[in-house]
Amino acid sequence: MAAMIRLFRSSSSSSSNSISLISRSLSTAAASETVKSQSYPHNPHSTSVDPKAKTVQWVFLGCPGVGKGTYASRLSTLLGVPHIATGDLVRDELKSSGPLSKQLAEIVNQGKLVSDEIILNLLSKRLESGEAKGEAGFILDGFPRTVRQAEILTEVTDIDLVVNLKLPERVLVEKCLGRRICSECGKNFNVASIDVAGENGAPRISMARLNPPFTVCFKLITRADDTEAIVKERLSIYWDKSQPVEDFYRSQGKLLEFDLPGGIPESWPKLLEVLNLDEQEYKLSPAA
């Protein structure tokens, strides 16, 4: 169950056994296809992604609040592969009153990043659970966050593509402060109405409010870590740590940098375009 933790702590003499254990959990597919590093929208048509060629094994990177979960979840449904979000794993552990819950609560409330050891532990358990259910492929959201995590992942599986979602800081802060959650069903909404000038001559970025149904309005809560101070602290920590991870995957030719042009209505079709995906084709496919 703690295969990734054992690998994280292991010496070189014992790492091969741990790697073998995690490799089985990850259900590694055929050798990965190289994807040229690029930044949308500068050259969206040069992507060589072919998700139908084999099992999808993708990673989504991006700042807190950028929308990793939203787009990874949509792609998960479209492609029929599990969406594994480390943020959800942490929140599930917090609700469980398990052995890590108190430690995690202190870390989250202070706006700090959860340690490699804890994340690897939670992810290992999730992967083993998925293996038992016959899952194949995955879209990882929020992992890896450090080069060490990326190195561990590389040792045990082939990552086909790493999508790095990007938004300006002002938009990220407003999005995070506008997040609301239904206290009963757990569904996410966003009450922020965003309209800001783009950076470096880019078009304006507009995002409409994602208003909840009237019956849900009185059940909305704000996440404890969605205060302006904590949001800015999270962004600062993320930027300090993310560049080495981006460079790691860029050097392998697997990084796709995607500047979100707006909200879901504007961004989703563009993301499908750079990934060479036809939503209607997948919806009509019996395997979808």
UniProtKB/Swiss-Prot annotation:
Cysteine pairings via disulfide bonds: none
Catalytic activity: AMP + ATP = 2 ADP
GO cellular component: cytoplasm; mitochondrion
Compartments it resides in: Cytoplasm
Keywords: ATP-binding, Cytoplasm, Kinase, Nucleotide-binding, Transferase
Enzyme class at the top of the EC tree: transferase
Quaternary organization: Monomer.
Primary role: Catalyzes the reversible transfer of the terminal phosphate group between ATP and AMP. Plays an important role in cellular energy homeostasis and in adenine nucleotide metabolism.
Name assigned to this protein: Adenylate kinase
Species in which this protein is naturally found: Solanum tuberosum (Potato)
